[in-house]
């Protein structure tokens, strides 16, 4: 989700589950599923993108400025705890997030961490 885009105001009716997260994350080139802190996580190369927390929230890598915008626009969906205050990450309540917003968040996290080769492959695939 770009800094200028705020979360969707009209919620998509598709319920977001971890299977939704998995499908969206693994659709991005080079993303692999593994474990982080004992829960499912996604990385591109060795770089963290997202992980499921024990409480069911999703931790997503996000720039600080974008995090502030999103938390201000939809605090019921996007939040942090003190633990994440100094990290470029944000918590996402899967029960509240719109699937399109989640897809955008995961794609932006991926774009910031993917290799130039993977980025080129992704863009080439979009042009087809």
Language-model segments: which ranges?
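Charge-dense, helix-prone N-terminal extensions
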Residues: 1-128
